[in-house]
Amino acid sequence: EACAICLIWSTVNNVHEKQLGEWLGDALPDLAITLSHQLNPILREYRRASSTAIDASVKPAMQKHLLDLQDDFRKKGFEGQLLVSSSNGGCMDVEAASKRPIHTVRSGPAMAPVAGKACAELERCKGPIVVVDTGGTTFDVSLIVDGDISITTETWIGERFTGHMLGLPAVDARSVGSGGGSIAWIDDGGLLRIGPQSARARPGPACYGTGGDLPTVTDAAVVLGYIDPNYFLAGEMKLDRGAALKAVSGLANQLKVSVSEAAFSILTVSNESMINA
């Protein structure tokens, strides 16, 4: 589906890298190809190779999604410029994003500090600002000092050192797998873990009643009564506390504790992960 090409000295002489790209393009015209010297022309080859591989891996899906989105807007009469948020806190043209989709990989977490800065300015808050963004899969936290959003080149997809280095400038937002849909599980050593696997929106937490049967952070909150199952989303969505109890009970049996104790442990570990972010 895709190919990443990274030769060690292509930033000095890109002839061989370009030639490989041309050969592959001729032989496989539908193949998504990323050349490292075009994407991230730096001497540090590990960072360059990592960013090239990430870009190539997301390119087939992102190109189709972004270009289809643009076509849909055009068909509906939209004549403006369609922009996509980027990992460095800015925006880029949708066609540019489809050619270099890696720049959108951390665009979600990057927008929280941008919004946080804007809100702080409206409130005339001048002190350091901690911005928190939590969803179904991750808990993201960033810091704004003196009105400046911190940018880093040390961003990892997944765990630091064991995940994949982005290798490009991005907003410095720390992410941990402690979202509402993060799944609680027991590792080989018998310790309780949260995430990074998530139930996501579908099938979702067990209490959603949409097919999920694994214990999540949201299920634990429902079991303990922290979330009112009858007034979720202002009453627009009813949650199934029985399903949440059943999901958490499986974990409780493994830990040999009560369901309430297991639910409390899930939230405790989740909260500790957020604090350590």
Residues covered by each model-derived region:
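N-terminally biased helix-coil "hinge/interface" segments that flank
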Residues: 1-277
